[in-house]
Amino acid sequence: EAAARGWDPISANFLLNKWVKSHWPKYVEGCERVGRPADPANWRVAKSVFVSDDMATAKEYALGAQSPYRYYYSQLLTKMKKHGRANLFKADQNMSDDEVTLDRVLEDCVIFGTPDKVADDILALRDNVGDFGTLLYAGKDWADVELGRNSMILLAEKTMPLVNAAIGTTKASQ
């Protein structure tokens, strides 16, 4: 319905890839209904991303006990389970709610690592969900200002040029 009204899609950072992937066909359907071209360049996909110069720092900041990503997803998972919506995080809808753990959610929803690894993960995301126009960096509270700032710089200056080279674009916003 949103596409038929002229709106462009944004897929949320807390969604499993299987849900993100389901957005494109619905967008196409809405566009076709009103004779509007469906352009993947208009699709924005948000992801929780953390980039660091070294893998150990990236892993600790993304997954560790004091991680802002852990805090964010802990809050979200707790609320979803409380209100009977844990299925949002289930790769298989037959899983029990107890099988939906915070560690599993972090593994499924957070892209982290060195610039090269994050580039590979973003390209794998595109392979999984399909072509999209813009990656939206879903920011979290910075538990460490320098690491948070450096993550954004590394993403812009190191990771995205690798991604853009691989997909054949030079658009800085992607």
Question: Which residues are covered by each model-predicted region?
Answer:
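A conserved active-site cap/scaffold subdomain adjacent to cofactor or substrate pockets
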Residues: E1-W24, V28
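Short glycine/threonine-rich loop-to-helix capping motif typified by GTGT followed
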Residues: D54-A56, V145-L155
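Short, solvent-exposed amphipathic alpha-helical segments in soluble enzyme
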Residues: G6, G64-S67, I153
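An alpha-helical appendage that flanks or caps ligand/catalytic pockets
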Residues: K18-V129, N164-Q174
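A short, mixed-charge helix-start or loop-turn motif at secondary-structure junctions
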Residues: P9, R104-D108, D141
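Glycine-rich, proline-tolerant flexible connector loops at the mouths of alpha/beta enzymes
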Residues: N13-L15, L136-R149
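Hydrophobic faces of well-ordered beta-strands that scaffold small-molecule active sites
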Residues: W7-A12, A41-K47, G133-Y137
